Each structure stands twice: as structure tokens, then as C-alpha cells.
């Protein structure tokens, strides 16, 4: 006899919702294996809890820009002690909490609805810091005003929209060398783990050091000396151990025993432990900041209307000179690599990549929603919106369709009214979650071609630079430049030596060409050119039709092999004892464990 969850999953799968989102059992010719309604809901909740910290963290960072608040104190140009200015900042922070939750809700819901991908969007970490501390400056001390910076973000979004509409972003992701695409997933996993170890968004196990880039932390923040934990105080912070044992070890054990919702359980348990005040692990210490946070937490249900950040764009571009253009270009190249790399890695993590075309279903809509969300977010007063690597938390819980992202969007919508609760999830509650997700993502390192240095070195540079520069974009840039330089030099040497000087193991290299299957033009343009009236709908002649993902992977492997040796066939597998063995993908391996 079927239990209630199976009955619900089967009923939804047979409905129009099941066919729309291609749930398992829906009868859709491209239904996604393992995609079940209740699993998608749980995955969406997991993604939300993993990235709920962005509500308070993004608001805190953007408040440091000063927003539209005006500082007129000549003696104190940053107005740190100006009462009126700081009161304005308090209003600004509440505005940013509402704005962050609102744009995250809208963008994540639309991403799931239109692209059917389990990828959530929100104002990006790193981009918000660049926006605040480099472009606008602390309390408006930078070269560009808050309004002009928002204008740069607004324009950037529409440039992205054009690039997405005409297929350039999709082509960039598909034309990227395979070793770089695989390494980006590993690098993002390491990047997530590093975030999970920090104080700002993790358990606080590491800090910076005077002599080394990072060192062991774990002390109470008040005991730090110049941002470094003294020797005797390291690993003495009670919140660190609550995060490790309740948010990490317990979650791992639950996952080992296949307990559904293990990640959510860990986050909720640590949060509940951290809310009471008279404890050593409280998130609300008896300080000015703690009192203010606790007063906000006690409201539980409230709605704060945005008062100061709506539509603050300034269009007098001459006042900033070249600084406006510099900010726009920087936002463009950082965001295009960051978001494109993240989306591709998340699509691979959930098993949605077609190995034949190196694209994923709904990519055009995914990139378009991302682009429009950037411009809409700027109208709310926010820094650029981007795909969140924390989406991997939901994917690791089994999320495979847009229902996951839509659930996350609904949670962000609810959080607008319950912002005191969701803004009070401590970073040590989600830190171990990020580390666990990172550990799942680095498994694709086994698929990187380590035998040929022309592929291995660029891949390693990419995955190493990402966490240590705290930037996905910089890692991709470093990896791509290294790949181009090494392989160009190899080609030059071969030409000059008439093919006599060939690097070791070159026959094992991954094939690459800029002529990707399907060409540069997006699917909707090709369908329109064929005279298809409903050109926005995919059909059997699309690059993702016909063979499907599984056959596509095999076709891609054979196409890459050419007429050469057996080892060249091995695009997505390893050779053991003369036989080619195809490893499980990350999503397949998780399904097996679940």
C-alpha cells in the first residue's frame, strides 16, 4: 500500500504541474529521473535556509555604502559618530533587508518557473562588497555616488539581456574547455567550503593572519587582536563547536542514514539553540548591536516598507567621468563569468548537462531571467543579482527542477514578513552546510583529465584561484588564460618543428573547438527561422532533443574520440584494465545514496 508521500508525488506527477516541470512519472518525453514533487519542495527549503544569511549580510554590506544618506560633517567625512546620519543608516538597513528578500523572491521564482532549473538567485556576495567598498566607498567616500552605481547595475542588466537573447552567454559556457568547466565545479566547492569556515558566513574556524593568508581561528570575536585569534584563545568559541557538532557532525550522520531533510534539521537546530539570550552561544549578546538585533527579532512578524532605496538611479553620467564606465565594465566581466560559471556548475551538479551540446535545458531563459533580475534589483536599490552557489545545498537534497527554485522564492517572499526570524539565522548554523555541499561538488575532480598537462594545469589553476581570491570570476579568468597560453605555445612549437616536437601524453588531451554543436544562435532564433509559430517552445529539432542527455553524452564522447586510440574515447570515464568505465555523475551518485 502506498504511503501518503508516494500518493502525493504520483498525483502531482500526473497533473499539468508534473508535465510542466517534467517530474518523474509525468509521461513527458524528457521527464527528469528522480524528480519528485515533495523532494523538490524539501530541496527548495534547504536552498533557502542555506542562503537565508544573505538577507542580513547583504543588508549590512550595502548599508556601509551609505545609500542615499547624506553626510555633511566636514570634521568626520564618513560620519561615523553623526547621530542623524546613523539613524538614516538604520532605516537604510531595514530597507535593504526588505529589498534583498523581495528581489531574491522574484528572481528565484521566475528562474524556476521559466527555466525549470533548481537554481536560486539573490544579490551576490563579492559583487555587493565591490559595489560598496570600491565603487561607492564606505559611507559614500568612493569615486561614484550610490545613485550612479545603481545606474551602472541597471545598464549592465540590459546588456546581459541582449547577450542572453542572442545566445552569446550560452555560447561562452558551451565553448569553454571541458577541463575548465569541470574545474569550475570543484573550485566552487572549495569556495563554498572556505565561506563556511569564515566568521562572516560560517562557523568561524579561520581568520586572516599577519604572516600567512589564513590561519586557525575559532576564538570569540571580542578576543581578537588586529583580526587574529591569540594562541591560547583559538578554538575556544562555543558557537564554533555548536556549529560543528549540531550543524555538521549530526547532519552528516543523518545523511549517512538517508534521513530526508537532514540539512534543514541541522540549520534549524543550531538556530534554535542560538536564540535564547542567557547562553554563551547566543546570537543576541548584551551589546548595542545585540540589543538592536534582539529587539528586531522579537517582532517576529512585521513588514517594513522600503523608504529610501526605490528607483534611486542618477542619469547625469558626466559627474563621475570614466569611473562610471570602469564600474560598468567591471560589473559586466565579473558577473558574466561568475553567473555563467555558477549556472553551468549547478546544472552539471543536478545532472542537467547534455554532454553532446554542452548546454542545459532552459539555458536561454535562465540567462535571460538572471539578466532582467539584475536591472530590477537595481530599482530596489540592490547590487547585482546572480546565481547562488548555495543552490547546491538544495540539489544535494534531490532538487532537479524549477519547483526547487520556486519554493526558495516563496520562502523569500514569506521572509519579507518574517524577516526578524530569517535575518536571525546565525552564520554558524549554515557554515557546515556550505562545507558539506562543497565536499559533494569536488567529486567531479575525478573526471578532470589529469594525464595531459595542457588540460590538468589550467584546471588546477582555475580550482585553486577561485577560493583563494574569493572570486569565481577570477578563477575562470586564470584558468582560461592559462589554457590558451599553454595550448597556443604547444601549437606554435609543433608548427615550427614540423610536428616532430609533441608534448607527452598529448594523445590523451580533451578535444576542443569554438564551433560548438548548435552554433551561436539560440534555439528560439533557429525555430523562428524555420517558420515555427510557437518559436519559444523546444521541439525535436533542437540541440537538446532527439538523443537526450544520456545518448547525447555518448555521442559527445564518440565525436570527441575521432579515429584515434581507445584513450581518446574516454571523455567522461576512466580506463581500468583496458576497459572504459563511466563513473556516476554527482547527481546519480547522490540518488544512489538516497
What is each PLM-predicted segment?
Residues 1-6, 521-594:
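Intrinsically disordered, low-complexity cytosolic terminal tails
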Residues 2-3, 57-58, 66, 103-125:
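Juxtamembrane transmembrane-helix boundary signature
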Residues 2-94, 229-231, 264-364:
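Helix-loop-helix hairpins and the membrane-proximal interhelical loops
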Residues 9, 13-54, 76, 83, ...:
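Helix-loop-helix junctions within the multi-pass membrane cores of secondary transporters/permeases
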Residues 63, 67, 116-120, 168-169, ...:
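Transmembrane helix-loop junctions in multipass membrane proteins, especially transporters and channels
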Residues 108-119, 253-258, 330-338, 370-380, ...:
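Transmembrane alpha-helix interface/packing and boundary motifs in multi-pass membrane proteins
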Residues 117-121, 262, 339, 382, ...:
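Conformational gate/switch positions in structured elements
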Residues 137-269, 406-538:
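Membrane-embedded alpha-helical modules
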Amino acid at each position: 500500500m502506498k504511503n501518503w508521500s508516494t500518493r502525493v508525488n504520483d498525483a502531482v506527477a500526473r497533473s499539468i504541474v508534473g508535465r510542466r516541470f517534467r517530474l518523474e512519472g509525468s509521461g513527458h518525453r524528457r521527464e527528469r529521473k528522480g524528480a519528485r514533487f515533495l523532494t523538490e519542495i524539501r530541496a527548495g527549503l534547504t536552498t533557502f535556509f542555506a542562503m537565508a544569511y544573505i538577507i542580513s549580510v547583504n543588508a549590512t554590506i550595502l548599508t556601509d555604502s551609505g545609500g542615499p544618506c547624506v553626510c555633511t560633517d566636514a570634521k568626520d567625512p564618513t560620519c561615523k559618530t553623526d547621530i542623524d546620519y546613523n539613524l538614516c543608516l538604520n532605516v537604510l538597513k531595514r530597507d535593504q533587508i526588505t529589498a534583498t528578500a523581495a528581489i531574491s523572491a522574484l528572481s528565484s521564482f521566475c528562474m524556476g518557473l521559466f527555466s525549470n532549473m533548481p537554481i536560486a538567485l539573490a544579490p551576490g556576495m563579492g559583487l555587493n562588497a565591490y559595489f560598496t567598498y570600491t565603487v561607492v566607498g564606505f559611507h559614500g567616500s568612493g569615486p561614484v555616488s550610490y545613485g550612479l552605481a545603481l545606474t551602472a547595475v541597471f545598464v549592465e542588466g540590459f546588456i546581459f539581456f541582449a547577450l542572453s537573447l542572442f545566445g552569446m552567454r550560452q555560447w561562452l559556457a558551451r565553448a569553454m574547455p571541458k577541463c575548465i568547466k569541470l574545474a569550475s565545479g570543484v573550485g566552487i566547492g572549495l569556495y563554498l567550503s572556505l565561506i563556511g569556515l569564515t566568521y562572516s558566513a560560517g562557523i568561524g574556524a579561520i581568520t586572516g593572519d599577519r604572516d600567512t593568508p589564513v590561519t586557525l581561528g575559532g576564538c570569540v570575536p571580542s578576543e581578537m587582536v588586529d583580526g587574529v585569534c591569540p594562541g591560547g584563545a583559538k578554538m575556544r568559541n562555543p558557537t564554533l563547536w555548536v556549529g560543528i557538532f549540531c550543524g555538521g557532525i549530526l547532519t552528516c550522520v543523518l545523511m549517512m542514514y538517508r534521513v530526508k531533510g537532514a540539512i534543514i534539521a541541522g540549520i534549524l537546530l543550531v538556530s534554535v539553540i542560538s536564540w535564547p539570550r542567557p547562553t554563551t552561544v547566543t546570537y543576541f549578546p548584551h551589546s548595542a548591536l545585540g540589543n538592536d538585533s534582539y529587539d528586531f527579532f522579537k517582532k517576529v512578524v512585521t513588514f517594513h516598507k522600503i523608504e529610501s532605496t526605490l528607483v534611486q538611479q542618477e542619469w547625469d553620467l558626466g559627474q563621475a567621468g570614466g569611473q562610471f564606465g570602469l564600474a560598468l565594465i567591471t560589473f559586466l566581466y565579473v558577473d558574466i563569468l561568475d553567473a555563467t560559471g555558477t549556472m553551468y556548475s549547478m546544472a552539471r551538479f543536478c545532472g542537467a548537462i547534455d554532454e553532446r551540446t554542452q548546454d542545459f535545458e532552459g539555458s536561454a531563459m535562465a540567462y535571460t531571467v538572471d539578466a532582467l533580475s539584475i536591472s530590477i534589483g537595481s530599482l530596489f536599490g540592490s547590487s547585482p543579482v546572480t546565481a547562488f552557489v548555495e543552490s547546491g545545498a538544495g540539489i544535494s537534497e534531490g532538487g532537479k527542477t524549477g519547483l526547487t527554485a520556486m519554493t526558495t522564492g516563496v520562502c523569500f517572499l514569506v521572509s519579507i514578513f518574517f524577516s526578524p526570524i530569517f535575518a536571525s539565522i546565525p552564520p554558524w548554523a549554515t557554515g557546515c552546510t556550505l562545507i558539506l555541499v562543497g565536499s559533494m561538488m569536488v567529486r567531479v575532480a575525478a573526471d578532470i583529465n589529469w594525464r595531459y598537462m595542457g588540460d590538468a594545469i589550467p584546471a588546477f589553476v582555475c580550482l585553486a584561484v577561485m577560493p583563494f581570491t574569493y572570486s569565481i570570476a577570477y578563477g575562470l579568468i586564470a584558468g582560461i588564460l592559462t589554457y590558451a597560453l599553454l595550448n597556443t605555445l604547444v601549437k606554435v612549437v609543433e608548427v615550427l618543428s614540423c610536428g616532430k616536437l609533441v608534448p607527452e601524453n598529448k594523445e590523451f588531451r580533451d578535444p576542443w573547438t569554438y564551433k560548438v554543436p548548435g552554433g551561436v544562435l539560440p534555439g528560439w532564433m533557429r525555430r523562428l527561422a524555420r517558420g515555427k509559430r510557437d518559436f519559444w517552445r523546444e521541439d525535436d529539432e533542437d540541440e537538446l532533443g532527439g538523443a537526450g542527455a544520456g545518448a547525447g553524452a555518448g555521442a559527445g564522447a564518440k565525436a570527441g574520440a575521432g579515429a584515434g586510440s581507445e584513450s581518446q574515447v574516454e571523455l567522461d570515464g576512466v580506463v581500468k584494465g583496458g576497459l572504459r568505465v563511466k563513473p556516476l555523475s554527482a547527481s546519480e551518485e547522490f540518488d544512489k545514496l538516497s
